[in-house]
Amino acid sequence: MKTIKEELLEKLHTKIDSVKHAIADQYEKIKPIAFKPETDILKLRKGEREHAMILRLTALARYKELQAIESSPFFFKCVIAHNTVDVRYRNKKEIHFGKYEFSEQNIYSWIAPIAVVRFANPGQTSFKLPNGTVKEITVHEKEQYMIVNGKVVFYAHETQDHPRELIYQEHFSAKKGAFILPEIVEIMEKAQDDVIRASHFGPFAIAGPAGSGKTTLALHRVAYLVQSPESMDLYPSNSIIVFVQDSGTKEYFSHLLPDLGIHNVKIKTFFEWASEILKLDTVAYVQNTECELDKLNLKNSVVDGGEKLKIDGEVITWNKNVFQTLRGIYAMSSSESLKNSFEEQIKRRTLDRIDITLALMMYKKHKGKLKIETESNRVMRMGKIVKHTRVDVLDYSLVVVDEFQNYLPEQLQLFKSCVSSKTESVIYVGDLSQKIQHGTIKKWDDFSENIAPDRQIRLHKVYRNTKQILEYARSLDYKVEIPEALKEGPVVQEKVFEEVRGEVENAASQNSRNIESQVFEYVENILKNKTAEKSVGILSFNLELLTRLRERFKDVDTSVKFLTIAESQGVEFDIVCLVGVSNHMFELAERYSTHPAFREEKHQIYKDLLYIALTRSMNEIHVLGTCRLKDVLVNLK
């Protein structure tokens, strides 16, 4: 005799099979339209041709949606009954919720108004229709699933009379970590729903520590704005831009957004975006230059003088040659080292974030608005060639700024100036306690952003890491909240390598080589013993050491990534090796030691970077160096 759990699981499998059969029927109807040869369409008359092409594109989009439904048809089911005197609607009804609507199987999209009922406890609740009508219902049963490639990997069930119960849970691989228990997933989804369904108009901020799910919340809000009938006309996907820190994050987003049904969204780094505006095709971007503090001080002295920007009363003039514009600005500095350093930049044709920000500020003041000007040649009658310039004023329906805390206030102001007045919609994602750049935003007032308190979402719990990793971070005096149901993992390994004494002559270089060889050997053992599917991140502040490690292991395993800590922000690995830990790893240049405010902010950035490094791992961390990490942090107080 079957148990109740077995019967429930069998019923779920029957439903999944029913969906698959219904999808197979839909495939047969859609395929002839979705895959109609373009040659056949081109044979049609003009009006018919355009109509056939639209039908083909629509059918192809639906075909891709059906493929996604087939893999993961739904993630929630509610058994409901409407609270009404009309007997036609008082019978119980099963409704499912998934990524895409499939009305043939009573599956609603997650953005449908009724989808909010999945967060209610069994019993009486309500939902609101787009026209404002409130529908009162009773939720009799709830079921939550995780279905991957048509296979059930998680299933929980609850009713009005019985609390939530786990029906089935498959073993989860280390790649994604153990499942973080239903109640935690449910809490995240409630926060997600509050975020995605908030009014579209105006700025929104989502903050939280690394691994708290803030990026997921932000991107689901984007998906909702693009797909919801109430907002989709205001947010065409090709009018949305997402600003990311680096190419690695860009690649991650470029895969994640289509999975949420979002296509044609622009994803750019600040430099890529600025390059289109300023025509920096032959310029290389560098993170920071040696005169960072001098440049920041000069930037902070720029005053808006109405029609012109000024420094100490002197007008800054715009030149199409960005290097000439910046040379004129830096000529106003009293720092000879800045002037000399920038001359070297001109020779190498490199610009940093401060250079580009100043140039964009000048461009905007000169042009009035940020715009992209594209030149092309047009062939006129009699073969005459005329140069044509197309001007596109930047006017985005939505701007998403990932890791907003790493931008200068002026950068954020430039982004904000390109947002449509119809929406004024910006989503800021990040955490002010994870800054990796000097001179960046400290508070919203820094660039005149006013975000209502109820639109500032703060996540506290971390879901990416193991309990042991967060306990280790807490032992280093980082303020971390550790969820009770968080997965367990191996204890953090901290290896201090001892210097081996040799001859007095060249002892320092010998010791350095000896320690480095021990680090290489340790890393080699980790790579030998790891399973094939596990990803490894080798992280360091020491770029030279990182380069030698990359060269040493370049042919060992392509799943191993060698990154600076700053480059690793937003990336995650199964195993992380933090290498090059020493008491000298955060020494400031002597010329900056007399600037207490600069030194204090730099020390805080270094502490934040260490926290970022520790939270890159989903399972296992090895800290390797000549001293303990706790000793390094003592020097940063």
State what each model feature region is.
Residues 103, 108-109, 191, 226-424, ...:
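Alpha-helical nucleic-acid-binding subdomain
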Residues 238, 247-248, 255-263, 268, ...:
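Conserved helicase motor core of SF1/SF2 NTP-dependent helicases
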Residues 19-22, 147-150, 180-192, 342, ...:
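Short N-terminal helix-initiation segments at or just after the protein's N-terminus
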Residues 186, 379-385, 557-563:
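Short gly/ser/thr-rich secondary-structure transition/capping motifs
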Residues 38-58, 196-207, 212-224, 228, ...:
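Generic detector of solvent-exposed, compositionally biased contiguous segments
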Residues 181, 185, 189-193, 215, ...:
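Short, well-ordered alpha-helical scaffold segments within catalytic/effector domains
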Residues 2-8, 15, 19, 163-166, ...:
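P-loop NTPase Walker
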Residues 1-185, 189-197, 428:
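Extended, charged low-complexity regulatory segments
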